[in-house]
Regions:
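Short strand-turn motif at the edge of the Rossmann-like AdoMet-binding core
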Residues: 136-138, 162-166
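Oxidoreductase and adenylate-handling cofactor-binding alpha/beta cores
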Residues: 168-170
Length: 170
């Protein structure tokens, strides 16, 4: 039987998913406490090529509810295929707009875009309290990595994971 906890474990081990951490039981966070068997509301940023593989792998777990899709090239055949498959998800071409307009519905994001975009997307998502799975490399410079590590400490309830396609089941 699939559960939210199994999804988290699988995602962490396979580095192809979103790891969603525990939430504290403080009064401020009661609205974020959810059941163990509830699906993770996921937004996928980058849904073609590698991003599409991540999207489908996460969907195949049965533990992710795909609520939003974002890709700059909505006209590409592989992107069109994924948009048709997840026709109920909101569609965006700009990740900032997606996080602004659909952010209240999103618990986690996957980042499967070209390398130069990993850092700004991950930082914005973390800053908004979203759990993040990002493909390698996390960022382009050591300074960007240091900023990400500082953000991970600052947003300690947000789980951030970097995956490596060569060591992933996706």
């Amino acid at each position: 039987m699939s559960s939210r906890r199994k999804f988290i474990k699988s995602a962490s081990l396979a580095t192809a998913g979103i790891a969603v951490g525990n939430w504290s039981a403080s009064a401020k966070s009661y609205s974020r406490i959810i059941g163990a068997n509830k699906k993770v509301n996921l937004a996928c940023i980058g849904i073609g090529n590698r991003g599409g593989e991540i999207l489908n792998t996460l969907n195949d777990t049965g533990l992710a509810n795909i609520v939003a899709l974002c890709d700059i090239d909505m006209g590409a055949p592989h992107t069109q295929k994924n948009m048709e498959q997840f026709s109920g998800a909101k569609k965006f071409q700009n990740f900032r707009e997606m996080l602004d307009k659909a952010g209240n519905e999103i618990e986690a994001v996957s980042v499967g875009v070209p390398d130069f975009s990993h850092f700004p997307i991950t930082m914005m998502a973390m800053g908004l309290g979203k759990h993040v799975y990002v493909e390698k490399p996390m960022a382009r410079t050591f300074y960007e990595i240091e900023l990400m590590m500082a953000a991970a400490k600052k947003y300690s309830k947000v789980v951030t994971q970097m995956g490596n396609q060569g060591h992933s089941e996706a």
